[in-house]
C-alpha cells in the first residue's frame, strides 16, 4: 500500500513518517485489516530528509493540480494532508493562505477523486475554526465561527472533506489539532509559535519572548500525542465517525504561567529567567479568539489520546532533544 503525506518535510510530517515506518502497516479499510506499507511519498515545498528505501521525497507546489495529481493514483491507500500556511502567515498574506490552504486542499481532493479508489483522507484542521462568542467549554456541537483567515481556510477544507466523503470520492475525516508544544527547530510564522519558543529556547540556553500575558490559556498537545492521534484517525473505521467527519482532538488547557512553571521545574530557575514578557497586540488579538477549553468526550470514546500534564510534555521534549 502507498501513502501520501503532504507537508511531510515539516516537523510533524517527519515524526509521522518515522512512526509509520516503525509500524510498517496501517489499516485503511473498514474490515480493520492492516496492510503492509510499501511506499510513503513525502511531499512538501522542500524535499524531506528521511533516508529510507520506502520513502519517496518529492518537492513541489501543493496548489498545482498537475503536480498533486502525479502523487495520487489507485494504489494510494491513504493521504494525510498536513500541508498548510500557518496561522500568522495566513493572516498577514491573504492570497498565499488562500492558495495553499484552500486551493491546495482542493487540488489534493480532486486528485483523490480522479484516482477513483476512494482513498482514506485525514485532513489536519485546527481549533482556529472556532472564535467569537463561544461557550466556556467547546464541544463538537458548537458551530465554528472563525475570526482569522487561517481558521476560515481550515473550515473550508473541513467542508470540502465532508462533501467529497458524502459523494463517495474519499473516506475523509478532519481532526482539529491543538497547538502542538514543544516544536523543535527554529521559530515559524505561526501565531501560536511562542508557546513552543518559551520552552524550547530557554532549555537550549537561549532567551525567548512571551508576547501574551501569563494568564493566556491555550489548548495544547504534545508532538507524541499529535502523531498518535493522526495515526489513529487514519486507521479508525468509517463507522466510528458517522455523519460528522470533523473532530476536536483531546488536549490540555494550560496557561502560559503554568507553562513557565513547568519550564522551571524541568530546566531550573535559570531557564525560567531567560523568558521575558513583551506583549504583541496582533498576536494577543488573534490568540484570544481561539477557545482554550474543550469537551472531547467523543474523541476519547473513539480512542484518541491525551497528555497527562504540561510538565510531562516539557520533560518529553527535554528527553527527545537534549541540549547540544
Task: Kindly label every feature range from the protein language model.
Residues 132-134, 147-173:
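Active-site Tyr-X1-5-Lys
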Residues 1-26:
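N-terminal Rossmann NAD(P)H-binding glycine-rich loop of SDR-like oxidoreductase domains
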Residues 103-148:
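Conserved Rossmann-fold NAD(P)-dependent oxidoreductase catalytic core, especially the SDR/UDP-sugar
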Residues 162-217, 223-225:
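NAD(P)-dependent short-chain dehydrogenase/reductase
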Residues 202, 213, 227-229, 233-287:
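Mid/C-terminal beta-alpha module of Rossmann-like enzyme folds, strongest
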Residues 63, 92, 96-107, 144, ...:
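Glycine-rich NAD(P)-binding loop of the Rossmann-fold in SDR/ketoreductase-type enzymes
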Amino acid at each position: 500500500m502507498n501513502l501520501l503525506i503532504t507537508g511531510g518535510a515539516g516537523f510533524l510530517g517527519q515524526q509521522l513518517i518515522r512512526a509509520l515506518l516503525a509500524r510498517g502497516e496501517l489499516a485503511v479499510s473498514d474490515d480493520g485489516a492492516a496492510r503492509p506499507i510499501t511506499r510513503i511519498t513525502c511531499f512538501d515545498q522542500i524535499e524531506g530528509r528521511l533516508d529510507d528505501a520506502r520513502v519517496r521525497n518529492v518537492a513541489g507546489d501543493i496548489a498545482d493540480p498537475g503536480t498533486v495529481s502525479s502523487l495520487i493514483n489507485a494504489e494510494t491507500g491513504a493521504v494525510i494532508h498536513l500541508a498548510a500556511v500557518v496561522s500568522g502567515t495566513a493572516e498577514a498574506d491573504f492570497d498565499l493562505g488562500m492558495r495553499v490552504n484552500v486551493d491546495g486542499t482542493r487540488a489534493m481532493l480532486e486528485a483523490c477523486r480522479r484516482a477513483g479508489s476512494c482513498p482514506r483522507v485525514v485532513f489536519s484542521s485546527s481549533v482556529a475554526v472556532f472564535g467569537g462568542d463561544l461557550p466556556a467549554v467547546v464541544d463538537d456541537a458548537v458551530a465554528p465561527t472563525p475570526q482569522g483567515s487561517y481558521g476560515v481556510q481550515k473550515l473550508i477544507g473541513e467542508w470540502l472533506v465532508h462533501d467529497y466523503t458524502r459523494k463517495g470520492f474519499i473516506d475523509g475525516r478532519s481532526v482539529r489539532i491543538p497547538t502542538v508544544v514543544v516544536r523543535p527547530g527554529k521559530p515559524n510564522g505561526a501565531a501560536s509559535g511562542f508557546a513552543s519558543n518559551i520552552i524550547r529556547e530557554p532549555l537550549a540556553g537561549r532567551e525567548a519572548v512571551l508576547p501574551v500575558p501569563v494568564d493566556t490559556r491555550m489548548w495544547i498537545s504534545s508532538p507524541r500525542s499529535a502523531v498518535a492521534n493522526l495515526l489513529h484517525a487514519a486507521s479508525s473505521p468509517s463507522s466510528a465517525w458517522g455523519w460528522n467527519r470533523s473532530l476536536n482532538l483531546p488536549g490540555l488547557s494550560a496557561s502560559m504561567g503554568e507553562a513557565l512553571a513547568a519550564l522551571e521545574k524541568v530546566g531550573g530557575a535559570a531557564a525560567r529567567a531567560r523568558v521575558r514578557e513583551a506583549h504583541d497586540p496582533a498576536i494577543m488579538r488573534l490568540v484570544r479568539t481561539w477557545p482554550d477549553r474543550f469537551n472531547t468526550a467523543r474523541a476519547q470514546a473513539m480512542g484518541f489520546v491525551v497528555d497527562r500534564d504540561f510538565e510531562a510534555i516539557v520533560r518529553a521534549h527535554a528527553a527527545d532533544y537534549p541540549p547540544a
